[in-house]
Structure formats: C-alpha cells, structure tokens
C-alpha cells in the first residue's frame, strides 16, 4: 500500500454516527424488552397461555440475538474509531518528522522517542488489547479495578454517545482514551496511551478537544473537526513524554484548533498560554461603588448575597451618578454583581441608555463569613481587613481571617475578580462603542472593598495605602485602563488622577510578580491533590514550574527596565486623608 488518502474527520464522524445508531437501537431494544418477553395471556384458557409463551420465547430469542449484535456493533465502532485515531497519529508523526527535518533539535529527540521507545510500546499494547487472548482475559484482568475504581486496568476507553458525548478514559495501566461523540471531548489515557480524538462539531459547532495523553507517556488526542462555520477543537496535551495532539480542522469559515502542549521532558506541540483572549486593544473600565445601604448608614459589615437594597439617599446617589456617567457615554457595556444594591445603583444608567446590565459574581463583595452584620469598628472588622490588605501587598496566599468566608484567600478572590474583568473586556470588544473621550469604556458596579482590593492587586501603579487613607465613598468611581495581556493602569481614584508608577512602586510591582507566582503554584498543586487525578497533579506541578520559572527569568529584566525608565513622575498629589470606611 504505497499511497492512501483518508478523510480522517469523516472517518471519526462516521464512527460517532454509528455509535449514535447503536445507542438508538439499544434504547429501542430495552424499551421493548419488558412488554414483549412477558406477554400476558389474553384469557385464562390453555391456548391463550400457549400463544403468550410462544411470543415471549421468540422475544427472548430476539433479545439474545440483539445483545450479541450490539456487542459486534460496539466492537466495530471501536475498531473504526481506533482506525481514525491511528491515521491521526500518523499525521502527527509526519508533522513532527517535517519539523525535525527543518532542524529542530527538540523535534528530533521527540521523533526518536516516538520511533524507538513509545511507538513500539504503544503498538504492543494495542495488539494485546485487540488480540483474541487479550479480549478473552480483559473481563478477568479488569474486574478488580472496575469494582474499586470503576475503570479498566488495561483497555481502550469507550466511544462517546449522545447521552455521554465525551470519550471514556483509557485503562489505568495502559489504553487510549475513547473518541468523543459529536462535539464531545476525547477521553484521557491512563499511565500509558494516547488521548482520544475529539468529536466533530455539528451544525456550526466547535470540535471537541483531544484527550490528554498518558500520565507517564502518550500523545495528546487530535481535536475534532469544526462544523460549518465552527472552529476545530484544540489538540490534547501530553504530560511528561509525548507529543501534543493536532488541532482539529476548522469548518468552512472557522479556524483550526490549537496544537496541544507537548510533554514536559520530551515532546513537541504548542506552548501553554496564560491570560485571556483579545488583540491587545486597550479599554477603560469605570468601577463604581453602589449607593448607600442601611448597613452603610449603621456602619455594619454587610457582604452577603443578595443583601439589602438602597436607602432613599442611596437611590438619589444612583440617579446622580447615572446622569453624570450618561453624559460621558455611550458605553460598551454595563455590569453589576449579585448584590441587590449594585443592581439598583446600575438601573438608572441602564434605563437612560436602554441597556441591560450583565450580572457577574466576580464583582460581589469580599465575603465576611461569621462576621456578617457585626460593627465595622470592632475586632471583627479589623480581622476582616487583615487578609485583603495582605493580598494587595503581594501575599494572596494569606487566608481570610473571617471564618466561613467563601473567599478563602486572595488567590480565590483574585481569580473570580480577574475572571469578571476578562468577561468585561471580551464583551467590550464584542461591542466596541467609543465613549465621548475616544475610549472603549464599560461601567462595572461593585462594592468598596472588591473594587479597591481587586484593582490594587492587578494594576501596574498600585497605591495600597489608598484603601486606608481614601476609601471609595458611595457611588465613587475607580477608573482603570488597559487589557488583560498588557496589564492595567490605575487612571483615577474617586475622581483624583493617579500618575504613572514611581520607581519604588515599579520595583514593588516587580517583586509582587516574583513572589506571587510560587504562591499560586503551591495553591494549585495543593488543590490538585484532592482531585484524585494524577493528570491534574502533574499538570499543576508543570504549570506551577512554568509560572515560577517565567517569573524568576522575568524579574531581573523588569527591574533593569524600571531603573532605566525611571523619570521621577509625580505619583499622587492632593489625596485627602480621612477616617477609613472600607466595608460597604
């Protein structure tokens, strides 16, 4: 066989279609089993009983034949899926060979590993799984792990179905992940094996992601092809030894999926990316604190969702800030939190502009736990402040000292907050309305501490003391500008302009970036230990090492750049000092 042309996407789609047909037939057989195998006699006479017994016997024979046919059908679908995966692996091998021919030393090492180490091991394992002896012994070999863990020891994962679109995981010791059903993700391998191929997208849908390769060695699965107008699915990643899977082909009008990340030690593939999407376009976000609430008036800690509404004064404040903001519009979007007070504060501006605010949980106030409804000026109020203040100083791992808080530490809080900011950014680019000042601007209504802590943890010109010396008042605004990729700059704080970072502030940010990376890495590794998934643990360790390594490498360059670029800008001027009122 010198030349073979195979439409691998069509082959994978055919396997998914056959699996769907099999699922439908099996469902019909099961639905007909009870009424046909247990036919009730029409009457109490012997003839009726004999006829019922005859029809029941025929039905039981049919069910036995149908079960055998279903087994053959499942085996055929698995073989067809395996064939599609085999062709996909061949394409990966060819692609990596081409990269090696172009002079890529890592690709050459990976090619050698694939050809002389992993390739033979994988081929031998698949031969055993598909051999008559392997199929006969599989129920015995896999019984213990199926009972204890619900997963085969040796074997390939099942193909996804309409009811369960994602491919099943491969055997714990050896086995490839199953192929995804239409739009489903490929299954992950166990210790050794390839990830399953993602399912093809349907009717403009995105192709499924390829499955993750084996914990020790194995290639990521290929992403599923996109439907018409849909993007291809991303290729699955390899963990320690193996190549990342190819991205699925995009449908007409879509784009191809990204190549999966190669193995940590040996492997080729795409690079991991940190951060959100976007094209680097800068936007402005006006963070606006809500109007006065009864809790504010009584100086109580009030953070729980949904919380109280606005006082009469708060409603007046909401209308006043709406009138002021409307004159500076139009806006790309309006956002608020799950708290009633932020929604009531956002409503007047939304009504003036005919817009519907989007609710983002990441804009909720930092949760006070058991300190809820206690006085702000009290030991509870001080303990509530300790953790968030530490977060702004570069220690997000410090826990919230309010028992019962859902924001257990600064890492949890900041990921929710930056997730909300990412959503605001994406929505703003999707509706790039330019405000009166020429910037794409969105308005986000939130609470004092979330606005203050969230901005100080992320802007490149922070001034954490502002949280204590100039807390944001009701309907006060904090303005930031930038994007998730290039970073954010604090433009103004409650109407007071904030200049670029001074040299000490810039150096503080450099140190902050250096010391926060290992904190995030340690927390992610700690969390991964509770998943019980070795792949999750390996990924957390790998991602953490990458993040810490990048921070260490970047630190001296950032310091040198800041020292060279230092120009002595006046940082802050005219900021009044007042009694803190940090808790809304």
UniProtKB/Swiss-Prot annotation:
Interacts with human TLR2. Residues 1-92 form the PE domain. Keywords: Cell wall, Isomerase, Magnesium, Secreted, Stress response, Virulence. Induction: Up-regulated under hypoxic conditions. The keyword Magnesium applies. The gene is PE_PGRS11. The active site is at residues 290, 365. One of its GO terms (cellular component) is peptidoglycan-based cell wall. Residues 384-584 are annotated as: Phosphoglycerate mutase. Optimum pH is 7.5. Active between pH 6 and 9. In the N-terminal section; belongs to the mycobacterial PE family. PGRS subfamily. In the C-terminal section; belongs to the phosphoglycerate mutase family. This is PE-PGRS family protein PE_PGRS11. Changing residue 290 to A: Lack of phosphoglycerate mutase activity. Could be an immunodominant antigen. Its EC number is 5.4.2.12. Transmembrane segments: none annotated. InterPro entries: His_Pase_superF_clade-1, His_PPase_superfam, PE-PGRS_N, PGM_Phosphatase, PGRS_rpt. Changing residue 289 to A: Lack of phosphoglycerate mutase activity. One of its GO terms (molecular function) is magnesium ion binding. Its cofactor is Mg(2+).
